[in-house]
UniProtKB/Swiss-Prot annotation:
E.C. number(s) listed in UniProt: 3.4.22.10
Top-rank taxon: Bacteria
Descriptive protein name: Streptopain
Role this protein plays: Cysteine protease that acts as a key streptococcal virulence factor by cleaving host proteins involved in immune response. Triggers inflammation by mediating cleavage of host proteins, which can both promote host pathogenesis by triggering sterile inflammation and/or restrict streptococcal infection, depending on host immune statue and infection site. Cleaves host gasdermin-A (GSDMA) in epithelial cells, promoting GSDMA activation and formation of gasdermin pores, triggering pyroptosis.
Quaternary structure and partners: Monomer.
Gene name linked to the record: speB
Record comment: activity regulation: Synthesized as an inactive zymogen to protect the intracellular components of the bacteria from proteolytic activity during protein production. Once secreted into the extracellular milieu, cleaved into the active protease: maturation can be mediated in cis by autocatalytic cleavage, or in trans by mature SpeB or host proteases. Protease activity is strongly inhibited by zinc and copper, which prevent its maturation into an active protease: inhibition by metal ions may be required to prevent proteolysis of streptococcal proteins.
Prodomain residues: 28-145
Amino acid sequence: MNKKKLGIRLLSLLALGGFVLANPVFADQNFARNEKEAKDSAITFIQKSAAIKAGARSAEDIKLDKVNLGGELSGSNMYVYNISTGGFVIVSGDKRSPEILGYSTSGSFDANGKENIASFMESYVEQIKENKKLDTTYAGTAEIKQPVVKSLLDSKGIHYNQGNPYNLLTPVIEKVKPGEQSFVGQHAATGCVATATAQIMKYHNYPNKGLKDYTYTLSSNNPYFNHPKNLFAAISTRQYNWNNILPTYSGRESNVQKMAISELMADVGISVDMDYGPSSGSAGSSRVQRALKENFGYNQSVHQINRSDFSKQDWESQIDKELSQNQPVYYQGVGKVGGHAFVIDGADGRNFYHVNWGWGGVSDGFFRLDALNPSALGTGGGAGGFNGYQSAVVGIKP
């Protein structure tokens, strides 16, 4: 048998054996958005954004600075560009996913050391990988009228963080992992769960008085404390003076004002069984909805909803409903690099939602809640495991 006939026979056997002959590398090349194309996409998006252009005297003033995504996000098939006049644009590196994933008209993007941002971005990575199984470009979804809601927290200047002075009353780190010796004796970070919740409470300036004390024991698996470690918050005795709990802190505030916010943060953290650490903390959204009602006296309308129970359209309708009633939404998910909690407090009416990450305004902007191609969602529009761990706490009002 000559080589030509042998080659034909081998190909036939592969086909009969069920092997896919289409080379996935070639498929990726067909749908890949290279760096030049990504930059062009960002420029086109900026040119259509009056808010971004307003910060520049002319189009020539606008320069793009590519952000290097490190850690879990390296090689993530996304391009992030900070805009010289303020703001950023996040572009997908594959045409089977939405072209623009997120943007901001001010500030800059930075995910380094910010687990909730990195975790959310990592969910984009996983969804883009899922979209690569398709052989069709992203076509979007049918146009659905969505409300435009300006950032509710921005309207009151609310931008909290996780360090000083917000964490002045969190537990003090007692021991550390190798290489973390500098953290010993420092207060733990407030945690993104407490920060997100406290920002919503500041928006409502409620309650004036706490309702119920809370105590719990830190998990014995926590490597930063000697065990057993019991934490207690005398919430029932608290008088929350919202005039002293400021919308944001620069470090120049009075001690009374600093202690006011740190007391709120500590109470919230303890009320949700915060698993404290030197640079982050974790807790579940089910505990947030319980704490708001039982410990802080919020309306019984407060409840948790899970992304896996809704189609994409119905899920976003739930978020839209809350925002239309001027109620910021507590949002949480879980990814490979940990959990992420943040506040959704606005919408641009084009499937982008305004996110306050709880890092003093860093990386705040408009983001898609997912990057899945509708063709990957299947019947009913569910999101499989990609959004299965996302949840929100809604109905938050006094």
